[in-house]
Amino acid sequence: MSSQYSNVENLSPQTIRQVMRELQEMETTPPEGIKVLINESDVTDIQALIDGPAGTPYAAGIFRVKLTLNKDFPQTPPKAYFLTKIFHPNVAANGEICVNTLKKDWKPDLGIKHILLTIKCLLIVPNPESALNEEAGKMLLERYDDYSQRARMMTEIHAQPAKCAAGAAGDSKDDDGPSTKKHAGLDKKLQDKKKEKLLKEKKRMLKRL
């Protein structure tokens, strides 16, 4: 899912400065519900935490997303992935995100902030017509209650704050870099409490079945 190498050396100094400036602005004045995670050693590897929007099955969850800039950025769009597992029509099994902004509607003057806001909006209004997860797309259209319950359960299992804090800053899999170790032990007590809450919620859901 992630690139094996950095594209920093392939980007123009102007593009690097532009990306760093935008990331620093978002760090200072973050968009509502979005926290950018800056990797100063590789601006082509951008991660952010997105709060699940209220009133959706993703509410109360925190989702880690990753943008990977290619050497032709901003002439071509970055790749976008959910590193946090999620049940959503427009997110593939490998986490890749399908949204028109990153495909046919891409424009070079669209910035990182716009992309992250678009991804957040996708949590509010999924597009089942261009589903990468066909099961989720069909369920959303035909059995919304089942879709909502499935998405909510995935959120409770995978998108809790402690899990996001423990996620790898470089990748969702086998990255043992300094950032991973730095976050891996955060808030163990909070994580234990979330596990207890999840078990109680599962019991309640089983009773309703």
Swiss-Prot record:
Q: What is this protein called?
A: Ubiquitin-conjugating enzyme E2 S
Q: What is its EC number?
A: 2.3.2.23
Its pathway, per UniProt, is:
Protein modification; protein ubiquitination
Per the UniProt entry, the disulfide pairs are: none
Pfam families of this UniProt entry? UQ_con
Q: What top-level class of enzyme does the UniProt entry assign?
A: transferase
The record's SUPFAM superfamilies line, in alphabetical order, gives:
UBC-like
Sequence ranges of Basic residues compositional bias: 200-209
According to its UniProt entry, the protein's GO biological process terms are:
anaphase-promoting complex-dependent catabolic process; cell division; exit from mitosis; protein ubiquitination
Q: What does this protein do?
A: Catalyzes the covalent attachment of ubiquitin to other proteins. Acts as an essential factor of the anaphase promoting complex/cyclosome (APC/C), a cell cycle-regulated ubiquitin ligase that controls progression through mitosis. Acts by specifically elongating polyubiquitin chains initiated by the E2 enzyme vih/UbcH10 on APC/C substrates, enhancing the degradation of APC/C substrates by the proteasome and promoting mitotic exit.
- Keyword entries, A-Z: ATP-binding, Cell cycle, Cell division, Nucleotide-binding, Transferase, Ubl conjugation pathway
- Domain named UBC core is located at 14-160
Q: Does the keyword Cell division apply?
A: yes
* Compositionally skewed regions (Basic and acidic residues) per UniProt: 171-199
- Catalytic activity reported: S-ubiquitinyl-[E1 ubiquitin-activating enzyme]-L-cysteine + [E2 ubiquitin-conjugating enzyme]-L-cysteine = [E1 ubiquitin-activating enzyme]-L-cysteine + S-ubiquitinyl-[E2 ubiquitin-conjugating enzyme]-L-cysteine
